[in-house]
Amino acid sequence: MADDTKWGIAHVHASFNNTIMTVTDQTGAETLAKSSGGSVVKQNRDEASPYAAMQMAEQLAEEVLDQGIEKVHVRVRGPGGNLQRSPGPGAQAAIRALARAGLEIGRIEDVTPIPHDGTRPPKNSGY
């Protein structure tokens, strides 16, 4: 007996200035819902905060559950490249809020871009 529940992919781009969340179908071709930190908080400094990520995740979960998606795989992305490899403060809060809002979490995957010896990093990067 096959499981007929629909899966989606929750893309969480968490930088230190903003957090952007998008939910797509399994192929990633069709966007089902999207939100960013600036759409849920007033202050620019709060866009990357865990509170903003929680509010965004609750909104997205509500929209996606209405469309019939019950389970999601989460793809977390940090700034990457020559910037930080670690995601911003909103990433963990977003995953927790998605689970708390009624979505079942499948896989959690880190898709931060890592250069294969790309351009020279800035001299004050601290690596």
Swiss-Prot record:
GO terms classed as biological process: translation
InterPro entries: Ribosomal_uS11, Ribosomal_uS11_archaeal, Ribosomal_uS11_CS, Ribosomal_uS11_sf
Any one of the GO CC terms: cytosolic small ribosomal subunit
GO molecular function list: rRNA binding; structural constituent of ribosome
Assigned protein family: Belongs to the universal ribosomal protein uS11 family.
Role of this protein: Located on the platform of the 30S subunit.
Protein name per UniProt: Small ribosomal subunit protein uS11
Organism expressing this protein natively: Halobacterium salinarum (strain ATCC 700922 / JCM 11081 / NRC-1)
